[in-house]
Swiss-Prot record:
Gene3D superfamilies attached to this UniProt entry: 3.40.50.360
Pfam families, alphabetized: Flavodoxin_2
EC number: 1.6.5.-, 1.7.1.17
Function: Quinone reductase that provides resistance to thiol-specific stress caused by electrophilic quinones.
Subunit text: Homodimer.
UniProt-recorded name of the protein: FMN-dependent NADH:quinone oxidoreductase
Amino acid sequence: MTTILRIDSSIKGEAAVSRRLTQRILDRLLEAHPDATVVSRDLAQGIRQIDGPWLGSVFTAPEQRTADQQEIARTAGAVMAEVKEADILVIALPVYNFGAPAQLKSWVDHIARRGESFVYTETGPVGLLTGKRAIVAFTSDGTPLGSELDHASGWLRQVLGFVGITDVDFVAADRMVFGADEAMARAEAAVAALAA
């Protein structure tokens, strides 16, 4: 059975264009995988930013963790498990000031962990999350996908590839202030063309 992990990250909640787009992508995937399990995480509802206590918790042996460290490690482990168990990731990438939202960066910090999602070898790093697909819903008011102003999509593609997820597609509703209807029409066409 297919497991789809949906990651929303906009602070606009239900009003977010990226959320509408992740829902359309999810609907398209469910047409092809009607029995899929869908796991959803809304990062705007809160995800811990990594800090000293987080680092100390996830890299301390389980039997040596304090009660506080056990709770932090449990939450961090749940975020990692969602990604490991997913076959397909649907990720909202709304662009804020030319980059990714802070909460999406925090999620990436949770999943890019040595020994969990990648290892270092004599020839360099090797991603461990292979065999997965990611579909990214890229939205922006004025930043074109892939332009020199876009510091979000290349970063996310790089991070996903680093952990082993190299099958990455982008669906863009970009430059919304220059024609929201046209941008959404292009995005809808891209969703319809997705190989589910």
